[in-house]
């Protein structure tokens, strides 16, 4: 017997459509101004660190696609009780990572790449577990790409180094605002 669900089909179509349109206009439906500013700074950091505009664009585009898809899944009530617990755990880990990043940015000589990288890897693993049955292997690859990129100890060390002070300041300002507003 074939099981058919129009809700499932509609959700699949919505995710497919949004993945094709993961540009700025669709992102504004799910990503506010502060988040957009942080993403712009992360793009600049990635571009300067990798010396590759296409690579920086790809990682931010993957991040936006994943964020939009997870938002659609959450908005449509696709997560069961155990998955909602995972979503809460992911949010807590992300919040912990943001507070750690802020602390490292505000207190001189406290930065440890391994600590921040470890938190990002934990976030990646929880998110992968959360979306395991909802997103395709291609989307799982996007999640790995984004978190592996930003948890690179070399990138993190550069971000907290003297050449990226301006970018780090703007990222910290955005993270602080998002934490204050309860968006992280």
Swiss-Prot record:
What PTM annotation applies here? Phosphorylated by TAK1/MAP3K7; this phosphorylation triggers association with BTRC and subsequent ubiquitination and degradation. Ubiquitinated in a BTRC-depdent manner; leading to degradation mediated through the proteasome pathway.
- Which InterPro entries does this one have? TNFAIP8-like (IPR008477), TNFAIP8_sf (IPR038355)
Q: Which UniProt keywords apply?
A: Cytoplasm, Immunity, Innate immunity, Lysosome, Nucleus, Phosphoprotein, Ubl conjugation
Protein origin, superkingdom: Eukaryota
- Where in the cell does this protein reside? Cytoplasm; Nucleus; Lysosome
According to the UniProt entry, where is the signal peptide?
none
Which coarse location class applies to the principal site listed for this UniProt protein?
cytoplasm
Keyword Nucleus listed? The answer is: yes
The terms describing its cellular component in GO are: lysosome; nucleus
- Using the record's annotations, give every residue carrying the modification Phosphoserine: 3
Checking Pfam families in the record gives:
DUF758 (PF05527)
Q: Name one GO biological process term.
A: T cell activation
Q: What does this protein do?
A: Acts as a negative regulator of innate and adaptive immunity by maintaining immune homeostasis. Plays a regulatory role in the Toll-like signaling pathway by determining the strength of LPS-induced signaling and gene expression. Inhibits TCR-mediated T-cell activation and negatively regulate T-cell function to prevent hyperresponsiveness. Also inhibits autolysosome formation via negatively modulating MTOR activation by interacting with RAC1 and promoting the disassociation of the RAC1-MTOR complex.
Provide the assembly information.
May interact with CASP8; however, such result is unclear since could not reproduce the interaction with CASP8. Interacts with RAC1.
Q: Which family does it belong to?
A: Belongs to the TNFAIP8 family. TNFAIP8L2 subfamily.
What does the record's free text say on domains? The central region was initially thought to constitute a DED (death effector) domain. However, 3D-structure data reveal a previously uncharacterized fold that is different from the predicted fold of a DED (death effector) domain. It consists of a large, hydrophobic central cavity that is poised for cofactor binding.
Name of the protein this chain belongs to: Tumor necrosis factor alpha-induced protein 8-like protein 2
Report which gene this protein is encoded by. Answer: TNFAIP8L2
């Amino acid at each position: 017997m074939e099981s058919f669900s129009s809700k499932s089909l509609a959700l699949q179509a919505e995710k497919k459509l949004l993945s094709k349109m993961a540009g700025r206009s669709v992102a504004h439906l799910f990503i506010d101004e502060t988040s957009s500013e942080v993403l712009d700074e992360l793009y600049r950091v990635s571009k300067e660190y990798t010396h590759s505009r296409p690579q920086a664009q790809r990682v931010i585009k993957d991040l936006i696609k994943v964020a939009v898809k997870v938002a659609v899944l959450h908005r449509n009530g696709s997560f069961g009780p155990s998955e909602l617990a995972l979503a809460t755990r992911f949010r807590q880990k992300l919040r912990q990572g943001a507070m750690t990043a802020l602390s490292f940015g505000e207190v001189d000589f406290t930065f440890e790449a391994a600590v921040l990288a470890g938190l990002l890897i934990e976030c990646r693993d929880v998110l992968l577990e959360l979306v395991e049955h909802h997103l395709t292997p291609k989307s799982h690859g996007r999640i790995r790409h984004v978190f592996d990129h930003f948890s690179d100890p070399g990138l993190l060390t550069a971000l907290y180094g003297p050449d990226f002070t301006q970018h780090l300041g703007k990222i910290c300002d955005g993270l602080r605002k998002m934490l204050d507003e309860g968006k992280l």
